[in-house]
Amino acid sequence: MKHSTLAWRQTLASLPMVGLIYGLTLVLGLLVALPMYSTLTTEDQRSLTFLNLLHGFDYTVVSDFMNRSGAAVKAVFGLVRWLNLTYLFLTVFLTGGILLRFAQLSSLRARPAGMVSQFRAELFWDGCSQYVGRLFRLFGVTLLFVLVTAVIWLIIGILVGSAVSSSETERETIGVSLVFFALFALTTTLLLCIGDFAKIILFRDDAHGAFRAFGQAGRLVLRNLPRTYGLYLVFILIGTGCFALYFVLESLLTVDGWLMIAVLFVVQQVLIASRVTLKVWWLGTAYSLVQSLPQPVRQVSAPVTSTLSTESAKEDC
């Protein structure tokens, strides 16, 4: 708990960084939202039929519109695939800068009270660019393990399903499928948790071996499951709770005009900002945990608060 509390204070001290990341996310969203809005306003031909959608989903209206203007809309949807790839790249790219920020704050904790470490964008971008290559290799390693476990669970699920399908009812077959899906979900989240801790190890040791860092992180997580994976699941539940709250609010709001559309937009942006904050908070918590937990493998190089974070600490002092 103390690591989460410390990381939360450091996250609050890094609100300019959180705002920068949120701004980049907003820009990416607008790159699709604006063309989509332009396409819809052009293709609707000022039809009043679309007003029916304010009172709830109307399949007939949507189906007629897609039959008439599906090609134009699908062209915009093609941008979504590129947006997802860009967002994925941005997520990996920004990780180095986020970790550098927490390393900077951790190295300056011994300063006199009242002194604060100012966020500097140029140092943040330097951290992003310095670690992006090795973090992408680590992303590839994590994805490889996720795909392998997915194939393994799929094969086991098919074998078990075919063995019980002849003797069990449809409901029981679905139950077996849900059990294997839950096992796959737990395995995947465990691998993603290990991947996040591997990022910290790569950063801390200034290392380049993605497989080696993943192995070290795996041993670290498995030896401290409640403090690592357990806490990771708590953060997932917090994020899930935020989405559930949004859907509850959306169901309660009657979107019947521009005012309510604006209110819903604000609620959505608050949700996105909270998701960004939660991601930064988790990385800070994981960084603090790695610094405090006993290491399963003897470190090869000196612990890194990175040349960049060391230089920034000297400048702040």
Predicted feature residues:
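Short membrane-interface loop/juxtamembrane segments of multi-pass integral membrane proteins
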Residues: 64-69, 123-131, 216-224
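Juxtamembrane transition segments at transmembrane-helix termini in multipass membrane proteins
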Residues: 2-71, 94, 175-209, 225-317
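Loop-to-transmembrane boundary segments
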Residues: 129-141, 221-234
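Polar-ligand-bearing catalytic/cofactor-coordination segments
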Residues: 102-103, 215, 314-317
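Membrane-interface interhelical connector segments
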Residues: 160-176, 207-214
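Hydrophobic transmembrane alpha-helix segments characteristic of membrane transport
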Residues: 92-129
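Alpha-helical membrane-spanning segments of integral membrane proteins, especially the hydrophobic core
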Residues: 73-88, 119-150, 171-185
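Membrane-helix interface motif
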Residues: 38-43, 150-166, 249-253
